[in-house]
């Protein structure tokens, strides 16, 4: 279990606390500039005390933020918003760089994990392509495969947490479906998943817990039905919101 205690970064993110249980999918939502990326960067340890981060991220009573990044990488995977490296390697070489180090794992387990992940994101025909020739959506699927392999339990028994910052942004509708299948597959291994997300209808459907941020402040926290209310969303996003039910499933409609 992960306990975030009083995490903050100046005026960009005021102190907030919450927990993420094993297998729980937690979505962080809010308008642009509300502090979503700041929160995820602080929890991941890539934003540090030098940048003004305070608070604790406790995983099994150990503070993630006091560990070297090399040790953090065994416990959590972090995917920031889209970037493409300047170096040029094939997809399979990039995925090899993403594999966890230090664990005593067999080649067969690595092969099995890689095969499962690349099938989930449909990369089977892209393994020998240069990452520099991929479309934005293809590259994002490669990045998702890499970070999920970093925490995949059969090859990294120490993993506890997967952090994804706006992972659906470069994906089309069909590829978004693959993303949520991948998230479910990771969560099913007992790993908590923390996702910054803009598609509130996906959050309403897939999130176990939701944090709604506004101007660096935690507006509300709880189950999706409790947080994604017409009144709360209208207040935070400054737009009219209606919640409707179609075929027994709730949807949000924005003006």
Curated annotation (Swiss-Prot):
Organism: Vibrio campbellii (strain ATCC BAA-1116)
Catalytic activity: an R-cob(III)alamin(out) + ATP + H2O = an R-cob(III)alamin(in) + ADP + phosphate + H(+)
A GO cellular component entry from the record: plasma membrane
Assembly information from the UniProt record: The complex is composed of two ATP-binding proteins (BtuD), two transmembrane proteins (BtuC) and a solute-binding protein (BtuF).
Name listed for the protein in its UniProt record: Vitamin B12 import ATP-binding protein BtuD
Limits of the ABC transporter domain: 2-240
Keywords for this protein: ATP-binding, Cell inner membrane, Cell membrane, Membrane, Nucleotide-binding, Translocase, Transport
SUPFAM superfamilies reported for this sequence: P-loop containing nucleoside triphosphate hydrolases (SSF52540)
Localization: Cell inner membrane
Family per similarity comment: Belongs to the ABC transporter superfamily. Vitamin B12 importer (TC 3.A.1.13.1) family.
Gene: btuD
Residues engaged in binding ATP: 30-37
Entry-linked SMART domains: AAA
Broad class of where this protein is predominantly found: membrane
Gene3D superfamilies per record: P-loop containing nucleotide triphosphate hydrolases
EC number(s) on file: 7.6.2.8
Record GO terms (molecular function): ABC-type vitamin B12 transporter activity; ATP binding; ATP hydrolysis activity
Keyword Phosphoprotein attributed: no
Presence of keyword Cell inner membrane: yes
InterPro entries: AAA+_ATPase, ABC_transporter-like_ATP-bd, ABC_transptr_BtuD, Metal_Ion_Import_ABC, P-loop_NTPase
Record function comment: Part of the ABC transporter complex BtuCDF involved in vitamin B12 import. Responsible for energy coupling to the transport system.
Membrane topology qualifier: Peripheral membrane protein
């Amino acid at each position: 279990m992960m306990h975030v205690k009083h995490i903050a970064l100046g005026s960009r993110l005021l102190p907030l606390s919450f927990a993420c249980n094993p297998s729980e999918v937690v979505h962080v939502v809010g308008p642009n500039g509300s502090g979503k990326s700041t929160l995820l960067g602080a929890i991941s340890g890539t934003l540090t005390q030098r940048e003004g981060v305070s608070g604790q991220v406790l995983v099994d009573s150990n503070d993630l933020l006091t560990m070297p990044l090399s040790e953090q990488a065994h416990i959590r995977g972090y995917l920031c918003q889209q970037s493409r490296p300047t170096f040029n390697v094939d997809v399979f070489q990039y995925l090899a760089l993403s594999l966890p180090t230090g664990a005593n794992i067999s080649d067969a387990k690595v092969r099995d994990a890689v095969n499962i992940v690349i099938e989930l994101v449909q990369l089977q025909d892209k393994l020998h392509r240069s990452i520099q020739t991929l479309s934005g959506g293809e590259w994002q699927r490669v990045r998702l495969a890499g970070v999920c392999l970093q925490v995949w339990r059969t090859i990294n028994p120490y993993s506890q947490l997967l952090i994804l910052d706006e992972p659906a942004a470069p994906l089309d509708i069909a590829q978004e479906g693959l993303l949520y299948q991948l998230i479910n597959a990771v969560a099913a291994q007992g790993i908590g998943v923390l996702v910054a997300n803009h598609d509130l209808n996906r959050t309403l459907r897939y999130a176990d817990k939701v944090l709604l941020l506004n101007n660096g402040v935690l507006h509300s926290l709880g189950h999706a039905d409790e947080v994604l209310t017409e009144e709360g969303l209208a207040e935070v996003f400054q737009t009219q919101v209606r919640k409707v039910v179609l075929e027994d499933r709730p949807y949000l409609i924005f003006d």
